[in-house]
């Protein structure tokens, strides 16, 4: 169990700095906005010491619902900047000392704050017009006399040369927009615009029963749908004290690793296409089809499987599942060597990727950039090793870590992880025990009152679920720690002083999925 601390708002920044420096809580795992009704509006922080893996949960609140304000911690953890903007967007809490207090997902002309419990949906009818572009942001600071003042600051100066990459650009891999300030071909500033595919999934969860919420996780990172749902099921099961059978743990682990291979093959294909290597693009898609066939035979779905459920999985594995998985692994190993011959060793690929988009280990931790991006920067951040779940504590595998922090390191981490995923599957596939594939659950699932957090290692990093329950059949608050939001928050750091063409390579190797960012 994690240690839990409540800190008064006026002491928050001081105490958080002590936790960061004194207790080495250098990783901000999750930052969640909350509406506790009459008890006020607030934030829950999940912190971790990357050396000892000790976790602390911190909460703070303000009772001023008319003009809620809390100190910003974005100067302590860089990843807090986008997370605090999200909280402002959803709850209207303004963070004093935050450098860019704009909405993150919603339009600037949006009325109200949708995750507040007293939010009135009628205030925002469907708009049929574009929003007016705004090139300013607000900065809130405390004066020496204790008064709070607001400042308006311009994001880009009038004499800066600005171009838009996205939201309708093939290399952004979805509806994401980068506003880029250029000096010649050199990137001087990058402003990320999210929210084009925001669907209000966390708000929707509050009016759904727990089994109904499961389908929404598949609509986040759709290339890690099985892993996302695994995290949510695990969070609910742990909260209820439900132990799934060992057979289920084996199946979930194997399916998670097949999903990881599937995602990394797609990463390889898309990066090759971005770099102009069309032949290699087809190689990855050709081989990925074999995994989708395996998924379809057992789950009925290819891209989105709808397979995990509370207490187990929806159906037992297909009769030929074991055979097909073993055949696929035997097929893919020699194919990976071919990938490296076609693309990895190519001099153009190496020139485009090596030394480009460098992210230091310290910045990776500060931004919370987990997954292949963090491990390429020398940070051993794999949830399967840090906090083992399912069968990961009983299998032998190597955590792939590189230290260069550039595009080529991020590429190689993912390619080498395919081999590790195959090794994990081979240790399990012939030893799946007999047993139930689903535990018997009550018709109406009620999670005991309390706060819960569970995380898995998704294809792009830590995917976490924070759940607050009041003992009802609906979640009081369900927050998803998207793997992609910390990644895009680090994009400006990686792109600054790079060439505009390098933006494509950097975005491709970061490997974000836009619906996962926007939720």
Curated annotation (Swiss-Prot):
Residues 159-519 are annotated as: NADH dehydrogenase I subunit D. It comes from the Bacteria. InterPro entries: NADH_Q_OxRdtase_suD, NADH_quin_OxRdtase_su_C/D-like, NADH_UbQ_OxRdtase_30kDa_su, NDH-1_subunit_CD, NDH1_su_D/H, NiFe-Hase_large. Transmembrane segments: none annotated. Keywords: Cell inner membrane, Cell membrane, Membrane, Multifunctional enzyme, NAD, Quinone, Translocase, Transport. GO terms for molecular function: NAD binding; NADH dehydrogenase (ubiquinone) activity; NADH:ubiquinone reductase (non-electrogenic) activity; quinone binding. It is an enzyme of class 7 (translocase). Residues 1-138 are annotated as: NADH dehydrogenase I subunit C. Coiled coil: none annotated. It is found in: Cell inner membrane. It catalyses: a quinone + NADH + 5 H(+)(in) = a quinol + NAD(+) + 4 H(+)(out). GO terms for cellular component: NADH dehydrogenase complex; plasma membrane. Gene3D superfamilies: Cytochrome-c3 Hydrogenase, chain B, NADH:ubiquinone oxidoreductase, 30kDa subunit. It is a peripheral membrane protein. Its main location: membrane. It holds the Pfam family Complex1_30kDa. In the N-terminal section; belongs to the complex I 30 kDa subunit family. In the C-terminal section; belongs to the complex I 49 kDa subunit family. HAMAP family: NDH1_NuoCD_2, NDH1_NuoD. NDH-1 is composed of 13 different subunits. Subunits NuoB, CD, E, F, and G constitute the peripheral sector of the complex. This is NADH-quinone oxidoreductase subunit C/D. It comes from Phocaeicola vulgatus (strain ATCC 8482 / DSM 1447 / JCM 5826 / CCUG 4940 / NBRC 14291 / NCTC 11154) (Bacteroides vulgatus).
């Amino acid at each position: 169990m994690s240690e839990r601390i409540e800190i008064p708002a006026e002491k928050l920044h001081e105490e958080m700095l002590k936790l960061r420096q004194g207790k080495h809580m250098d990783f901000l795992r999750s930052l969640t906005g909350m509406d506790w009704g009459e008890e006020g509006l607030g934030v829950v922080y999940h912190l971790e010491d990357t050396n000892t893996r000790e976790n602390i949960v911190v909460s703070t609140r303000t009772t001023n619902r008319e003009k809620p304000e809390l100190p910003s911690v974005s100067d302590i953890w860089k990843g807090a900047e986008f997370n605090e903007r999200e909280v402002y967007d959803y709850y209207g809490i303004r963070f004093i000392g935050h450098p860019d207090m704009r909405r993150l997902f919603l339009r600037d002309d949006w009325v109200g704050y949708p995750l507040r419990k007293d939010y009135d949906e009628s205030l925002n009818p469907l708009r049929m017009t574009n929003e007016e572009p705004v090139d300013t942001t607000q900065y809130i600071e405390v004066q020496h006399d204790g008064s709070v003042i607001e400042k308006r600051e311009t994001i880009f100066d009038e004499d800066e040369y600005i171009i838009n990459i996205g939201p309708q650009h093939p290399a952004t891999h979805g509806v994401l927009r980068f506003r880029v300030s250029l000096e010649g071909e050199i990137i001087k500033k990058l402003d990320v615009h999210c929210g084009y595919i925001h669907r209000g999934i966390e708000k929707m969860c509050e009016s759904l029963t727990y089994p109904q919420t499961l389908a929404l996780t598949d609509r986040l990172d759709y290339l890690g749908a099985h892993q996302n749902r695994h995290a949510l099921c695990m969070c609910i099961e742990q909260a209820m004290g439900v132990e799934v059978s060992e057979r289920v743990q084996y199946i979930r682990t194997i399916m998670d690793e097949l999903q990881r291979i599937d995602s990394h093959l797609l990463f390889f294909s898309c990066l090759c296409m971005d770099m102009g290597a069309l032949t290699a693009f087809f190689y990855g898609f050709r081989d990925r089809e074999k995994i989708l066939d395996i998924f379809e035979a057992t789950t009925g779905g290819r891209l989105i499987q709808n397979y995990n459920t509370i207490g187990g999985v929806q159906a037992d594995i297909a009769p030929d599942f074991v055979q097909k998985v073993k055949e696929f692994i035997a097929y893919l190993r020699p194919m990976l060597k071919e990938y490296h011959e076609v693309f990895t060793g190519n001099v153009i690929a190496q020139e485009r990727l090596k030394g480009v988009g460098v992210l230091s280990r310290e910045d990776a931790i500060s931004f919370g950039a987990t997954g292949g991006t963090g491990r390429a920067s020398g940070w051993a951040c794999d949830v399967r090793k840090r906090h083992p779940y399912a069968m990961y504590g009983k299998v032998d595998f190597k955590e792939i870590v590189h230290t260069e922090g550039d595009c080529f390191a991020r590429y190689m981490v993912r390619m080498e992880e395919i081999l590790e995923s195959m090794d994990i599957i081979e240790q399990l596939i012939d030893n799946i025990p007999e047993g139930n594939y689903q535990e018997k659950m009550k018709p109406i699932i009620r999670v005991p009152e309390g706060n819960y957090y569970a995380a898995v290692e998704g294809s792009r990093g830590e995917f976490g679920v924070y759940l607050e329950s009041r003992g009802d059949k609906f979640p009081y608050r369900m927050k998803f720690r998207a793997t992609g939001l910390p990644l895009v928050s680090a994009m400006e750091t990686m792109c600054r002083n790079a060439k505009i063409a390098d933006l494509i390579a950097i975005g491709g190797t970061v490997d974000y999925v836009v619906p996962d960012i926007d939720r």
